[in-house]
Amino acid sequence: MTILNADRWLYEQLTTDGQLSAALGGRVYMDIAPQGAQYPLAILTLVMAQQISNLFTDRVMDAETWQVAIWTDAPSYTDIEPIADRIREILHKASGAGVLATVYQEHQRMMERNGDKEYKAIILEFKIFTQ
């Protein structure tokens, strides 16, 4: 498994689900959304990857921490809560080619202001075990 396979797997999970496609309209991005992107949208970010080794320091697998941030420009979190719930439902305990397991860890909320405009996010954090 290469590092990019986890990226591709995660992106595929979020873009091939019918409910998420309807809610996000395909607006799932790696690291940053393009300027002028419509909301709501999801941004995937690799926070860190740590090698898990045996006693002989042979690589057994990698433990990758990923954040999925669902952003809105609406005045409340209400419209993105079902999206966050669906992402958690899809990813928690999921596996696939090169992905041994995915575990939901935590979430947080965040708000940013840019001029008069407010943006809100629900950020989900997952541990993805890859090999």
Question: Language-model segments: which ranges?
Answer:
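Small/polar-rich, solvent-exposed N-terminal microdomains that initiate assembly or binding
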Residues: 1-58, 78, 85, 89, ...
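Solvent-exposed, well-ordered amphipathic alpha-helical segments
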Residues: 44-46, 62, 104-108
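Short, solvent-exposed beta-strand/turn "edge" segments of beta-rich domains on protein surfaces
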Residues: 55-61, 113-117
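Acidic-leaning, charged glycine-interspersed low-complexity segments
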Residues: 16, 89-131
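Short, amphipathic alpha-helical segments
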Residues: 78-81, 120
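Charge-dense, low-complexity intrinsically disordered segments
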Residues: 1, 74, 78, 113-116
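Oligomerization/assembly interface segments of phage tail-like spikes and tubes
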Residues: 59-74, 120-131
